[in-house]
A protein has these predicted regions:
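SAM-dependent methyltransferases
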Residues: 1-163
Length: 163
């Protein structure tokens, strides 16, 4: 202490608000079995994001396949992260086949695309997106992270086929 003040002052809320936000360049792709718990999806997402040194605010969107539009665990994850949730058609995810690290016959039979988590993350990031964390899985869910070359916003997602 010098002059009665601690050497390391806590960052005030005002100073936190003045810090620039990190660019929203990460797309978090999620696939899951019907009815997968929000707890399981969140735990998998947290572990996957930790692999890329996740910082609050860097997730631009939680993305998946249209078949999962009403999946409570995916919707809860997006709300928890403060990120929008967007969905792609199976046809749009099928277009990402060549960029997938793994193709699943079981997923293809169920959805019409070869991979949901990786495909959705890559689709959200556009043709110059990079897969940072390939598909990770828990018992009933999958998760992947891709990075776009520029911030991802609603306009970019709509152009890339998200709904």
């Amino acid at each position: 202490m010098s002059g009665g003040l601690p050497e390391k002052m806590p960052i005030s809320a005002q100073r936190l608000r003045q810090r620039p936000l990190p660019p929203r360049v990460l797309a978090l792709g999620i696939g899951c079995e019907r009815g997968c718990s929000a707890v399981e999806i969140a735990a998998l997402a947290d572990a996957t994001l930790a692999e890329v040194g996740f910082e609050i605010g860097t997730v631009a969107a939680v993305v998946s396949i249209e078949l999962k539009r009403a999946e409570p665990g995916i919707l809860a994850l997006a709300a928890r992260l403060g990120a929008p949730v967007w969905f792609f058609t199976a046809a749009r995810l099928l277009a990402e086949t060549e960029r997938l690290s793994h193709r699943s016959t079981a997923v293809f039979r169920a959805t019409g695309c070869w991979g949901v988590a990786e495909g959705a993350a890559l689709a959200a990031c556009g043709s110059d997106g990079v897969l940072l964390v390939p598909k990770r899985r828990s018992r009933r869910a999958t998760c992947a992270v891709a990075r776009a070359s520029a911030p991802i916003d609603a306009t970019a997602l709509a152009v890339r086929g998200a709904r």
